[in-house]
């Protein structure tokens, strides 16, 4: 309803924003992107309103408390909201090589992460690329 299509819509339209808490990855991402646009959070109505989870942000929007917030696709979909991607994040689990050999739990964890059952469940949430999930690599390998 507010014609929100991209990040600049947050300060160009009369919309109420719900933010993530200071220090969260989502908040750091937003602040970085705003800096690239030369915009301050003070220019966004509701920037000071904070929630602590992606689902709380989505609930704030679906309840009408806010018009827009930034979060993950799974939270948006589970609350019946439209999702507009702003970027992608990659995560790696880093384990010392000695633990790979001396800790039986690590290979079990990697086997679980590489299992088709878990990958399928995560894909069903929406918004996740599981193609490299469970893959083992050494630091310095290309992880793009």
Question: Where would I find each of the regions flagged by the language model?
Answer:
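Short loop->beta-strand "edge-of-pocket" segments that line small-molecule binding or catalytic clefts
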Residues: 7-30
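Periplasmic-binding protein-like
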Residues: 81-111, 130-138
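N-terminal hydrophobic or amphipathic helices and topogenic motifs
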Residues: 2-8, 14-16, 116-144
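A ligand-binding cleft/hinge motif common to bilobed small-molecule-binding domains
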Residues: 58-88
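Short helix-loop capping/hinge motifs at secondary-structure junctions, enriched
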Residues: 1-5, 39, 98-104
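Small-molecule pocket liners
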Residues: 1, 15, 89-93
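Short beta-strand-to-loop elements that line the ligand-binding cleft
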Residues: 41-53
């Amino acid at each position: 309803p507010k014609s929100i299509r991209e990040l600049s819509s947050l300060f160009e339209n009369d919309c109420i924003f719900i933010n993530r808490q200071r220090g969260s990855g989502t908040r750091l991402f937003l602040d970085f992107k705003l800096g690239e646009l030369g915009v301050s959070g003070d220019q966004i109505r509701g920037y000071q309103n904070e929630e602590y989870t992606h689902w709380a942000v989505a609930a704030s929007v679906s309840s009408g408390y806010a018009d827009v917030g930034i979060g993950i696709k799974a939270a948006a979909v589970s609350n019946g909201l439209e999702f507009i991607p702003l970027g992608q994040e990659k995560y790696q689990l880093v384990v010392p090589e000695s633990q790979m050999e001396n800790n039986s739990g690590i290979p079990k964890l990697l086997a679980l992460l590489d299992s088709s059952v878990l990958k399928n469940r995560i894909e069903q949430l929406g918004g996740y690329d599981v193609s490299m999930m469970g893959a083992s690599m050494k630091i310095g390998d290309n992880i793009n």
